[in-house]
């Protein structure tokens, strides 16, 4: 059934635009250039407003997810990476459940990637239509069919651009992946803005600066009671404060510390006697994949819930899924869940909120830990990083584990890899919950993604530089 499905979608994959693999080795400086160009295009798209929208001043229903999904309201990057991640989530789960069987051959892998891309474009069209028809940019009946179609086309083309930019980096022209690059950029931009924003906000206490650090100096300069000003800078409500900033730095440090946790399995060459090495199995074996997939799941649940709430607000089943309220305190107007399943799957706003509603906190913790562990365990089976796949890679490199025969390598790797995947996913979820409870800027999920992605890029740079260095040693 699985192979038949991949064969059925094969003709459709041919019509999709594709980035060809490089025919030569791309040099490090060239990779940096292509990565910078990709990031520049993404940032430009984040600033270009959608043509034809009547208004985007209403409460933002996806405010909480925008940082993680690298989206920017009212611009070409309205959808961000949501369609790509959602298609990846669904296709990987289908493959993991063996509903779609993907073989080890390059042909099957290519067909699977093509199916994922096709599904991603289908989701882009679907989300574009939902955004327009639910009135995010104004009443569709007032805008007219032509304008609605124009906005949908703009969102579709922007989605295609994101997909191709990601593929450009994935094919080896740049460093890392487009998805990771866009997420990290968006989160870091948010953290810097919340710390140094010069924007003023009219609160009940008077005009205040949004940026936590700028607010500190402003409060100390304008208030006569310096102790009270200092306390306000650290603990003010509805705007970024210094405790949020300290929590963010603390979580950054903790995640970087855990990145170093790993088990080194001793391996040796089957061909050359005396050639020894180690195969590292990290605590975060699947890196940030669990948190990305979990974010995609929650964001799509939010989309469905708010779409149904807008149409059938009094329905009991719709209310059980989620009820929503609008707020504009301390920033732009945004919608947030106040009841139903969506409320319990959303993070508490602060540690005080945890004490006010402990049931909400417990459900959220269980959901985060369980979903991250599940996605991490599932991911290794469909991404070519399971014990069986690793044993196959070592065999192809003519490496064996010391003290074990080739036939027993899979059994030995199975002792470590599934455990590292599940426990690593659990730790990722726990750190995300901790960051949320401490009130870290950019949400716990966002901080986790930013740190793991930046660390990945650090490792890529070190690897690329070592290769350049070894080549230089050979040449000179």
UniProtKB/Swiss-Prot annotation:
SUPFAM superfamilies: Preprotein translocase SecY subunit (SSF103491). It is found in: Endoplasmic reticulum membrane. GO terms for cellular component: endoplasmic reticulum membrane; Sec61 translocon complex. Keywords: Developmental protein, Endoplasmic reticulum, Membrane, Protein transport, Translocation, Transmembrane, Transmembrane helix, Transport. It is a multi-pass membrane protein. InterPro entries: SecY/SEC61-alpha, SecY_CS, SecY_dom_sf, Translocon_Sec61/SecY_plug_dom. GO terms for molecular function: protein transmembrane transporter activity; ribosome binding; signal sequence binding. Residues 54-76, 139-144, 194-240, 310-354, 442-445 are lumenal. The SEC61 channel-forming translocon complex consists of channel-forming core components SEC61A1, SEC61B and SEC61G and different auxiliary components such as SEC62 and SEC63. The SEC61 channel associates with the multi-pass translocon (MPT) complex. NCBIfam families: 3a0501s007 (TIGR00967), PRK08568.1-5 (NF006341). This is Protein transport protein Sec61 subunit alpha isoform 1. It comes from Bos taurus (Bovine). The lineage of its organism: Eukaryota, Metazoa, Chordata, Craniata, Vertebrata.
């Amino acid at each position: 059934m699985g192979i038949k499905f991949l064969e059925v979608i094969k003709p459709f994959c041919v019509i999709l635009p594709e980035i060809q693999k490089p025919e030569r080795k791309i040099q490090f400086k060239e990779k940096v250039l292509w990565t910078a160009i990709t990031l520049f295009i993404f940032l430009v798209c984040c600033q270009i407003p959608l043509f034809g929208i009547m208004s985007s001043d209403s409460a933002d229903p996806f405010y909480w997810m925008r940082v993680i999904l690298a989206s920017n309201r009212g611009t070409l990057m309205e959808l961000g990476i949501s369609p790509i991640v959602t298609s990846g989530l669904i296709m990987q789960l289908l493959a993991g459940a063996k509903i779609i069987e993907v073989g080890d051959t390059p042909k099957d892998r290519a067909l699977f990637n093509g199916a994922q891309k096709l599904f991603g474009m289908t989701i882009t069209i679907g989300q574009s239509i939902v955004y327009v028809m639910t009135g995010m940019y104004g009443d569709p009946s007032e805008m007219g069919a032509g304008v609605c179609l124009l906005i949908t086309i703009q969102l579709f083309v922007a989605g295609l651009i994101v997909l191709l930019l990601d593929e450009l980096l994935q094919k080896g022209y740049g460093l890392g992946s487009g998805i990771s690059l866009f997420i990290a950029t968006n989160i870091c931009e948010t953290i810097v803005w919340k710390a140094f924003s010069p924007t003023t906000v009219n609160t009940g206490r008077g005009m205040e600066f949004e940026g936590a650090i700028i607010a500190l100096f402003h409060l100390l300069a304008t208030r006569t009671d310096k102790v009270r000003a200092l306390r306000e800078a650290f603990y003010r409500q509805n705007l970024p404060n210094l405790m949020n900033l300290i929590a963010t730095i603390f979580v950054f440090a903790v995640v970087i510390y855990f990145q170093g946790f790993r088990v080194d399995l001793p391996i040796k060459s089957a061909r050359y006697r005396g050639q020894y090495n180690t195969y590292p199995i990290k605590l975060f074996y699947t890196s940030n994949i669990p948190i990305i997939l979990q974010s995609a799941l929650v964001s799509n649940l939010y989309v469905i819930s708010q779409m149904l709430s807008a149409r059938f607000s009094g329905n009991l089943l719709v209310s059980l899924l989620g009820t929503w309220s609008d707020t504009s305190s301390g920033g732009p107007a945004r919608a947030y869940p106040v009841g139903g399943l969506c409320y319990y799957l959303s993070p508490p706003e602060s540690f005080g909120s945890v004490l006010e509603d402990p049931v909400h906190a417990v459900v959220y913790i269980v959901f985060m830990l369980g979903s991250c562990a599940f996605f991490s365990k599932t991911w290794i089976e469909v991404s070519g990083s399971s014990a069986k796949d690793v044993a196959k890679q070592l065999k192809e490199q003519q490496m064996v584990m010391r003290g074990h025969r080739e036939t027993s390598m899979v059994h030995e790797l199975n002792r470590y890899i599934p455990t590292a995947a599940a426990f690593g996913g659990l730790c990722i979820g726990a750190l995300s919950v901790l960051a949320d409870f401490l009130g870290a800027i950019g949400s716990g999920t966002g901080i986790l993604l930013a740190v793991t992605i930046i660390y990945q890029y650090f490792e890529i740079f070190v690897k690329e530089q070592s290769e350049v260095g070894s080549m230089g040693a050979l040449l000179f």
